[in-house]
């Protein structure tokens, strides 16, 4: 159910970031922050971490471990080429911090705005 929605949000976000479109990326962050529940926001974070790990695996020339479907192959390969080596590690760490903060009732809007900025800067 949420897979398609989450993939759309993630690809829109990462495409905006690699295109250096900060406004577009921040708009994506607002859309994610507006997901109807904290559980759904956390589920998106888990999904996004998995996507970032797939990008990392492809960067490491381990596509078989990444388990990327045929239709998503081109997208992940393109992102792997666009993202620096440290981007994946930093981003997964930042996403984990967001999940912890969601549990502490911190404003989602602030959290996802901050996450987008950090992703943008760490590219």
Task: Give names to the regions the model predicted.
Residues 1-47, 51-123:
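Charged, glycine-rich active-site and insertion segments that engage polyanionic ligands
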